[in-house]
Amino acid sequence: MARTITFDIPSQYKLVDLIGEGAYGTVCSAIHKPSGIKVAIKKIQPFSKKLFVTRTIREIKLLRYFHEHENIISILDKVRPVSIDKLNAVYLVEELMETDLQKVINNQNSGFSTLSDDHVQYFTYQILRALKSIHSAQVIHRDIKPSNLLLNSNCDLKVCDFGLARCLASSSDSRETLVGFMTEYVATRWYRAPEIMLTFQEYTTAMDIWSCGCILAEMVSGKPLFPGRDYHHQLWLILEVLGTPSFEDFNQIKSKRAKEYIANLPMRPPLPWETVWSKTDLNPDMIDLLDKMLQFNPDKRISAAEALRHPYLAMYHDPSDEPEYPPLNLDDEFWKLDNKIMRPEEEEEVPIEMLKDMLYDELMKTME
């Protein structure tokens, strides 16, 4: 028996089809009747967990901030609640995209299509163009993975799902850092940078570059590069390809347990990519960029802005059309609160009423 899904939305939208469901949200395609434009409407029911409310506020604030960026999904409209007491669900109207990179890669493996080197270049360029802008605003996305990269038939790519993103304190350093912060719910394991598992002292925008490198490799081979079953297996797979960390890189690791684990592994040289994939016809520029993205030490990893200038992306690189954004205003009450939360248990101490007020205020703001 079919389950009924209720969307309490204005009459100018006509629901068409269910697109997807997640832990606390449902997405349907719809038509904006006055214009005939197809849209996606996301229904979020975040109030079962404070964590979901903070993610929802983050998502709305950041998508507002990056509104109209060609490679970041846009919120076109929000359904304003009648009152805060009637706020039981959040409805966001977004651009409708046809698929995501995960589905495209899966289809490639099923023999339906093959990603050409041109496709791989263009998708990589668009991911990095988005990351340059995100990082310039001193934001780390923290969940870059194929299913969060939406695509249409023109091969336009848009980054979505900013619910896990974090804002960094202002700094004159170009490689922004978030000192000491980590939670158990960041980043899908296969795309997770080694510093997250090894508790380096600082977490930086380089985390997103590692994820982008994993995705570049997956587009080339059609298979996840580091499909770890658990923490130890993930680390084993990374070191199997990158080789044993240098003494300098080893000393960046702060976790005593992680250091002992790595010290007890056999010494290994890095594997050539031709060996990793059993391929000999690899684009040398792609290999060079991949090496620069997948540096074990985040300080040695290429930045998004540097990667856009790499020869592999020369066909698309246009310095006049790769925007930077000013840093977010961290005096905003939500960002001040968000940046104080260092552990999940601290999130639980925040009154749900305060978070609901912040979410309501965000929904009542006009679209700019």
From Swiss-Prot:
Q: Which GO terms describe its molecular function?
A: ATP binding; MAP kinase activity; protein kinase activity; protein serine kinase activity; protein serine/threonine kinase activity
Name under which the protein is recorded: Mitogen-activated protein kinase KSS1
- Native organism: Saccharomyces cerevisiae (strain ATCC 204508 / S288c) (Baker's yeast)
Q: One Gene Ontology cellular component annotation?
A: cellular bud neck
The subunit structure is:
In the nucleus, KSS1 forms a complex with DIG1, DIG2 and STE12; in contrast to FUS3 the interaction of KSS1 with STE12 does not depend on DIG1 and DIG2. Phosphorylated KSS1 shows reduced interaction with STE12. During pheromone activation and phosphorylation, KSS1 forms a membrane-associated complex with the scaffold protein STE5, the MAPKK STE7, the MAPKKK STE11, and the G-protein beta subunit GBB/STE4; interacting directly with POF1, STE7 and STE5 proteins.
Q: What is its EC number?
A: 2.7.11.24
Q: Which family does it belong to?
A: Belongs to the protein kinase superfamily. Ser/Thr protein kinase family. MAP kinase subfamily. HOG1 sub-subfamily.
Q: Where in the cell is it found?
A: Nucleus; Cytoplasm; Periplasm
Q: Which gene encodes it?
A: KSS1
Question: Which reaction is this enzyme known to catalyze?
Answer: L-seryl-[protein] + ATP = O-phospho-L-seryl-[protein] + ADP + H(+); L-threonyl-[protein] + ATP = O-phospho-L-threonyl-[protein] + ADP + H(+)
Record-annotated Protein kinase domain positions = 13-313
Q: Which residues carry this modification: Phosphotyrosine?
A: 185
Q: Please name the catalytic residues of this protein.
A: 143
